[in-house]
Amino acid sequence: MKKYVIFDIDGTLNQTALYAIEAYQKALKKRNITVSDDVIFACIGLSPAAIITKLFGSLDDNAYQVWRKDIQEYEFSIMKDRAKTFDGIVEVLCELKRRGYQLAICSNAYPKHIKQVLTMIGIYNYFSEIGSLKMGNSKAEVLTKLLEKLNCQKACLVGDRKFDLEAARVNHIPLIGCGYGYAPNEIQEADVVINKPLEILEGIDYLI
């Protein structure tokens, strides 16, 4: 029986705040825009379009492309020294693979960014499939297409935001909500809520 554990990235696998807040502040300062770190923190895990709406309201295509270029450059520069997984994630991924689970990603980002981040934090090779914004306009849509591609008998999503919960519900699979992530108040209705990565293993055993 083919079983998949499907992971969100930001706030689930990756300690994104370690580099993203500074990168965004640099890009905003370049545009003479001042926002609090809390505003940027709330953007972590959102789709690129949702981040633009939250920070700017709207941008024309040229301004958007320049913005994305700046963010990518600032993030990559800072990531080289700071990027890392949450403690225990590598051990969890290794153990899930040992137990015979297949691993996949479901993300609000685009493939190039996903590969860059997962490679930088040293876990890219654990995942056999990547679900990205190329597959849909929302996390629920991405997960639908990903599940169709995986054609698995059982699956569980692991994430830390309300759109992870929504995606799991729309697609009728259980969610492990990461209380250690960036929006613990958003995932209290998950099937299992955990407080540290190592608890993912017990949650998976219980749910699938």
Model-derived segments and spans:
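Active-site neighborhood of HAD-like aspartate-dependent phosphohydrolases
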Residues: 1-41
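Conserved Lys-Pro-Asp/Glu-containing loop-to-beta segment of HAD-superfamily phosphomonoesterases
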Residues: 2-4, 139-165
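Substrate-recognition element of Asp-dependent hydrolases with the DxDx(T/V) motif
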Residues: 24, 92-119, 133
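Helix-loop "lid/cap" segments that line or gate small-molecule binding pockets
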Residues: 27-28, 47-61, 117, 146
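Conserved H-loop
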Residues: 34, 123-128
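Metal-dependent phosphoesterase signature
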Residues: 54-90, 94
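Short acidic-hydrophobic, aromatic-tinged amphipathic segments that line or gate anion-handling sites
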Residues: 131-132, 192-199
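Acidic, Mg2+-coordinating phosphoryl-transfer loop and its flanking beta/alpha structural elements
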Residues: 157-195
